[in-house]
Amino acid sequence: MALAQWPPTLPKWPIVQPEKTMPGLLPHVDPNGLLEFSVVYTDRALNHMSQSFQGVMRDISGILKEVYHARSAVLVPGSGTFGMEAVARQFANDKKVLVIRNGWFSYRWTQIFDMGRIPAESIVLKARRTGEGHHAPFAPAPIEEVVAAIHTHKPDVVFAPHVETSCGMILPDAYMRAVADAVHAVGGMFVLDCIASGAMWVDMVECGVDVLVSAPQKGWSGSPCCAMVMLSELARTRIDSTTSSSFACDLRKWMQIMEAYEAGGHAYHATMPTDALTRLREVMQETRRYGFAKVRAEQQLLGDKVRALFQARGIPSVAAPGFQAPGVVVSYTEDPDIQSSKKFLGQGLQTAAGVPLQCDEGPDFKTFRVGLFGLEKLHNIDRTVGHLQAALDRIMPAQAAPSAVQPAAQPA
């Protein structure tokens, strides 16, 4: 008796399904879909092969390309950090890299590199205080220093955070463009972490970004379920000659999965969070209908008003003027119950505890963090500011001040 062929012949992707459908078992999952007898899902989850989910993937890809002006859009299941590691394991293997470290979450690049022994060499340029005293604000490494270091070291890849969540710092467009021009001049690529950017979406073409990493839960008001990785023309060209050092986080493979969906079919690498991605698609479409420019303006205005509120109360910002992010406000404190967020919890607010920067800040560095993400906050700015003001009135009654909702002055 002849033995069965092993390994079996696998289908060629993308697989294009016929148009014929029939009612699914549960109307709230896939009402026009097929009865579920695959080996991947049950009737309670949307199948990745379904016509419905194929539309979800195409819609997400289209919106990501539209907003970021990207050549390619890739979804990597997991979270934003999975996307960071996928990028590192795709483009930084045995390469020379340079990291602009503005705090704990750009220190994460170094943690990923060290854990996986990924690059051949890593240079780090840290944020630093702009003055004396333990409450002096921080600014990123001067752009002249960054450009000089790139020309000297000639890194293959430069990694930077658009918004650093640990200190509430944002890189201006001109800063990013200067980094991009410098690394492109030495033949390298520019990778930008936009996971904490909120609605301050970056134009990859204008800012010269080659790889942009984002996630659903901050800028897109979605449930965390994946990383979004956008590629420029240069990155899309170069990825074909790279090999990932990860199976689950193989960025090129996940790119091929998305391209299969874009071609009108589907493909499989690992199980995707189909229901969470469906909800993400819905809120992305909601944001598009409302207007991307309008949402971005709301993000900036909300950040300005909250920073003005804090400034009026004498609460010092960790980020220096000119680098203050509108989506994350991080402030100094000497009160351990504010640093831990305990006092805000007592007022019904879930804020975030302060974290170190890994930028030589010293042992007396104490902060607390306030996130200003999501359509509910952005569409209701005065209500959002009012919630914070009421909590501060009770937490810091001696420092209570009249309503301060005018935008803080920003340097030119």
Name these PLM-found stretches.
Residues 205-217, 227:
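Conserved active-site segment immediately N-terminal to the catalytic lysine
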Residues 133-198, 211:
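Active-site phosphate-binding strand-loop segment of PLP-dependent enzymes
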Residues 311-383:
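Conserved C-terminal alpha-helix-loop-beta "cap" of PLP-dependent enzymes
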Residues 217-308, 312, 376:
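Active-site C-terminal subdomain of aminotransferase-like
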Residues 82, 92-156:
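PLP-dependent aminotransferase-like
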Residues 6, 10-19, 362-412:
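PLP-dependent enzyme catalytic core of the Aspartate aminotransferase-like
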Residues 1-51, 65-68:
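N-terminal "arm"/small-domain region of PLP-dependent enzymes with the aminotransferase-like
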Residues 38-83, 108, 112-114:
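Conserved N-terminal alpha-helix of the aminotransferase class I/II PLP-enzyme fold
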